[in-house]
Amino acid sequence: MARGSGAGYRCPVPEGHTIHRLAARHAELFAGDKVHATSPQGRFAEGAARLTGTVLEGTEAYGKHLLHHHAGELTLHVHLGLYGRITDGPGEPPPPVGQIRLRLSSDTHWLDLRGPTACELLTPPEVAALRDRLGPDPLRPDADPDRAYARIRRAATPLAALLLDQSVVAGTGLIFVTEALFRAGLPPTLPGRELSPAGWRDLWADLVALMTVAVERGRIDTVREIHLPEAMGRAPRVDRHGGEVYVYRRPGAPCHVCGTEVSRGELAGRNLYWCATCQAD
């Protein structure tokens, strides 16, 4: 992504890859610059005043959490949640429209944050506490998958629920979990304690691979080459989430591998999708 490559960069569904893309984008636009911060909405006015005049020293993503590290041991913590979004652009920012929680600007660029679940300033101990309550992030080089497996192998909880628990694995959302379980041939209801160490190593490696590709492409693609539309002679997927997937949001459609109708169920208030043949108990 070239610096200043155009206005209106908007985040897609905020799974972990999106936050890593945003962290890289914001470092590219603002790192090393003195920033000015305002809160047109007013809800972050005190925090914005503390940020104004500081230099953004670096950015970081941990799971679904975005961190801006500023001089003076100030860290801006953002969690987009379901409704948050960020836009940015070059030059002077436009007149504020809508509920802008935070507007950050430098001499060359601006960004607007709307609708986040969290927008707050953290001290170094609070940043450490945030990291401590999160599981390993497959996109981080410091991730320790054994720490996640220590939780999984003791749990009777369904594997899908464990993988969606951010204290077990950070950054994985419903699309990555649904698709990784399909690719591994594992039913989403499998109790965590029934997953073997080798099975976990393979599943973790696939999550790393899928999420890394998503960072590079800006969308989630999970189908292997032999199941791409051009290889199978089928129409491309049409969905606001984009990307080619096996089972996510495809209930009743034929499985790309075996032709069985994709199933849908509910787990802890979340929709799950799976193939009863490819992911048999």
Regions found by a protein language model. Name each.
Residues 2-281:
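Structured catalytic/nucleic-acid-binding cores of DNA maintenance enzymes
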